[in-house]
């Protein structure tokens, strides 16, 4: 029997700059699943943890960065055939200080800040590219405009 699980967060890190935004891309380490694939911050929601708490924790664990502003953006499904589970990923956008030092966790070996168009090309998974497009559409002016009160977590 196939199950549905809300168990994953994806977080797109944005370094705002008047000259143009940059998006953090992370390359997976050789010892992990999908070695050398480029992705966004991605991780599991721990038992008893809200998705937004998981997002902040995963950003800290995978990059060492502190989230300055957090927005919920979309929910995306994907299928884990080995677990017979439709996994729902809660997608967030996090504004961070792009000048702050990055401390990569064990899952990643490289990082690169890229303009949004280049990040769209870098991400391996089509769902990540679509989510980044949604982030850019909703937050492209620097905030969520008329829906700020609904999307902004803090």
Go through the PLM ranges and name each one.
Residues 20-61:
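Conserved Nudix-box catalytic region and its N-terminal flanking loop in Nudix hydrolases
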Residues 6, 76-101, 112:
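Active-site-adjacent beta-strand/loop module that shapes the phosphate/pyrophosphate-binding cleft
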Residues 91, 102-135:
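NUDIX/MutT-family hydrolases
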Residues 14-16, 29, 95:
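A generic structural motif
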Residues 1-24:
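Conserved N-terminal beta-strand and adjoining loop/helix that marks the start
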Residues 127-154:
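Charged phosphate-binding loop/patch that engages nucleotide di/tri-phosphates or the phosphate backbone
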Residues 4-6, 18, 33, 84-87, ...:
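A generic fold-level signal
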């Amino acid at each position: 029997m196939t199950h549905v699980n809300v168990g994953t967060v994806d977080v797109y890190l944005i370094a705002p700059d008047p000259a143009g935004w940059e998006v953090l891309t992370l390359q997976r380490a050789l010892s992990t699943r999908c070695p050398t694939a480029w992705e966004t911050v991605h991780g599991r929601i721990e038992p008893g943890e809200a998705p937004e708490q998981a997002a902040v924790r995963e950003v800290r664990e995978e990059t060492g960065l502190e989230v300055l502003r957090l927005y919920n953006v979309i929910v995306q499904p994907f299928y884990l055939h080995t677990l017979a589970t439709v996994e729902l990923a809660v997608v967030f956008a996090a504004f961070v200080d792009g000048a702050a030092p990055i401390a990569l966790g064990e899952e990643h070996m490289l990082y690169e800040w890229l303009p949004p168009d280049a990040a769209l090309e870098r991400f391996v998974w089509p769902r990540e590219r679509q989510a980044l497009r949604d982030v850019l559409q909703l937050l492209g002016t620097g905030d969520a405009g008329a829906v700020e009160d609904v999307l902004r977590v803090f």
